A protein has these predicted regions:
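Conserved short alpha-helical segments that host acidic/polar catalytic motifs at enzyme active sites
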Residues: 1-263
Length: 263
């Protein structure tokens, strides 16, 4: 049992306080899932790319005496690899010791960047986009929003999720939303249970797709990425998902200028 929410302002102009609105909606859904909360929000595109990534899980901070040194080493390796690929970091923010936001300039293949960075042990890219910012962590919406400073996020639309873990671990990796890697600005949230997860996951992995968790919801994001990589537009891919996915489900998907629902 989880909660999902979405909002879009088609005539937002310079944007509205999407962060505050999403937090209000997700906090109202706290009873549907107290384990973790996630946001996929869309701000103004200034021509740069936003990379949201983590170098550890929140629980890791309590699990190892060496974790702070490990986190430092991982972050230094990420920075080195970005430099090696010619990625110019113009702004860095670290809302937590393990979660980071980089604003970058890069005109090359962002999939190559994502793969090279995620090759670092313990590192996961949560999202890449010109307007998408994906934030998720343990706790309810008020906790996550305050931790990441989301209450004044200005944008046009967003989707979010409150999670009650039933099929996978309680950690950031298993929290929603999921980025539709490697497509910039595409994210998914889901409520329900997919009964053909493992069969379809193995098929997609054989096709070269990667999964970062054991959460069945990630299958939706990977499937949409697969279909769009083969030329489908978002609406066509979503219609195909109705037959492809087995189980009881409802999901929301957002792009830089669209918000859709399938069930």
């Amino acid at each position: 049992m989880c909660g999902i929410a979405g909002i879009i302002h088609k005539k937002a102009g310079k944007g509205v306080n999407i962060g505050e609105q999403m937090t209000s909606m997700l906090q109202a859904l706290k009873h549907r899932g107290p384990d973790s909360t996630g946001y996929a929000m869309y701000g103004k595109d200034n021509g740069n790319q936003i990379i949201r990534f983590k170098v550890a899980e929140a629980a890791d901070l309590e699990g190892s005496y060496d974790i702070h040194a490990i986190i430092k080493d991982r972050l230094e390796t990420v920075n080195s690899r970005l430099t090696e690929l010619g990625v110019k970091v113009v702004k860095k923010e670290s809302p937590t010791e393990y979660a980071h936001r980089y604003e970058v300039k890069f005109s090359g293949d962002m999939k190559k960047v994502a793969d090279f960075v995620e090759d670092v042990e313990g590192v996961e890219i949560l999202s890449i986009g010109n307007s998408l910012e994906l934030v998720k962590d343990l706790g309810d919406a008020s906790v996550v929003s305050n931790q990441y400073g989301l209450n004044d996020f200005n944008g046009t639309h967003g989707i979010g999720h409150t999670r009650m873990a039933t099929e996978s671990d309680v950690d950031i990796r298993s929290a929603h939303p999921y980025w539709a890697y490697p497509f910039s600005d595409v994210a998914v949230v889901h409520n329900g249970q997919l009964t053909n997860y493992w069969t379809n996951r193995r098929a997609l992995e054989r096709s070269g797709h990667r999964f970062s968790s054991n959460c069945d919801s990630e299958l939706i994001a990977v499937y949409l990425a697969d279909r769009m990589s083969q030329g489908d537009d978002l609406e066509t891919a979503m219609k195909g998902s109705i037959d492809y996915l087995d189980g009881v489900f409802t999901y929301l998907v957002a792009t830089k200028d669209q918000l859709g629902m399938a069930k």
